[in-house]
């Protein structure tokens, strides 16, 4: 029996999308993206977004649902994902939730209770003008508990926590909880030895360049302005600097590889803390068969 929801998770460059495409074909399933950057239109190469051909062969959802200048809250993502899951469950269609954004996945698998506070552009701009360091220190004063879960450089989550506090008068940490779904969930995680993952990260970064990533960054910067928050995210920030004459292409590649390795380590730590995940070695020649066995055992 196929689980109503199958999660494919893990660090970046572990082959989640590749496995998901094969599983979807075998199971006649749909794919829901759990990637906080693939939701944005035009940010394609740097987010390793499924190609148009892949999206045409297998139905994909929660990709290209926002303009680059828009903000999608975790609550909004959760609501859209839950609605799609309910729709496909009613149609008895298997659903694959695929990605490396741990909070997106947890919002679905654990049914996180999330404050329904709409984005506050003016308030966010005020905090942005004050700078990330100051904003984070302010958050530490009003909600020290949530600061334990937010990196000092994570501007998006810092601003979200601050706006929730200033709109509701209560820390976001006191408004969060869990309400787990009633349907069954199978979580499959992909992992491999660190040296193999390093090699995959290097290969992916070079592939991004070969696919035209420099041109993508240049086009986005000219269209939306170089201070667009998305251009300050992994990969885009390093190549933005190169496009603007700060450093060489080789340095942009090296910095992207380094920062991606660091990011992958944080992702791995997050997912490894979840005891519900069934881990598979992505180098196994029978990876697809192992995954299918887990699914049919549910």
Curated annotation (Swiss-Prot):
Keyword Magnesium among UniProt keywords: yes
Catalytic activity: adenosine(37) in tRNA + dimethylallyl diphosphate = N(6)-dimethylallyladenosine(37) in tRNA + diphosphate
Binding locations of ATP: 10-17
A Pfam family this chain is assigned to: IPPT
Site (Interaction with substrate tRNA): 101
Domain of life: Bacteria
Similarity remark: Belongs to the IPP transferase family.
HAMAP family assigned: IPP_trans
Record-given protein name: tRNA dimethylallyltransferase
Species of the source: Picosynechococcus sp. (strain ATCC 27264 / PCC 7002 / PR-6)
């Amino acid at each position: 029996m196929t689980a109503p929801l199958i999660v494919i998770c893990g660090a970046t460059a572990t082959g989640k999308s590749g496995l998901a495409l094969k599983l979807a074909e075998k199971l006649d399933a749909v794919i829901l993206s759990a990637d906080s950057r693939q939701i944005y239109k035009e940010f394609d190469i740097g987010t390793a977004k499924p190609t148009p051909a892949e999206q045409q062969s297998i139905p994909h959802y929660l990709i290209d649902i926002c303009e680059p200048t828009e903000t999608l809250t975790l609550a909004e993502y959760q609501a859209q994902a839950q609605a799609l899951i309910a729709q496909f469950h009613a149609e008895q269609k298997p659903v694959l939730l695929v990605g490396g954004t741990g909070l997106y996945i947890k919002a679905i698998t654990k049914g996180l209770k999330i404050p329904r506070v709409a984005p506050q552009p003016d308030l966010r701009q005020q905090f942005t003008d004050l700078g990330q360091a100051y904003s984070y220190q302010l958050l530490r004063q009003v909600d020290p508990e949530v600061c334990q879960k937010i990196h000092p450089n994570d501007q998006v989550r810092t601003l979200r926590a601050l706006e929730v506090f200033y709109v509701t008068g209560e820390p976001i940490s006191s408004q969060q909880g869990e309400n787990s779904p009633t349907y069954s969930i199978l979580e499959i995680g992909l992992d491999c030895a660190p040296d193999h993952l390093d090699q995959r990260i290097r290969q992916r970064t070079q592939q991004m360049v070969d696919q035209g990533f420099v041109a993508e960054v240049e086009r986005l910067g000219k269209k939306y302005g170089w201070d667009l928050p998305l251009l300050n995210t992994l990969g885009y920030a390093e190549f933005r600097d190169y496009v603007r004459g700060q450093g060489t292409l080789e340095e942009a590649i090296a910095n992207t590889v380094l920062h991606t390795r660091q990011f992958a380590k944080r992702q791995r730590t997050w997912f490894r803390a979840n005891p519900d995940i069934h881990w598979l070695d992505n180098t196994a020649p029978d990876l697809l068969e192992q995954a299918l066995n887990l699914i049919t055992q549910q």
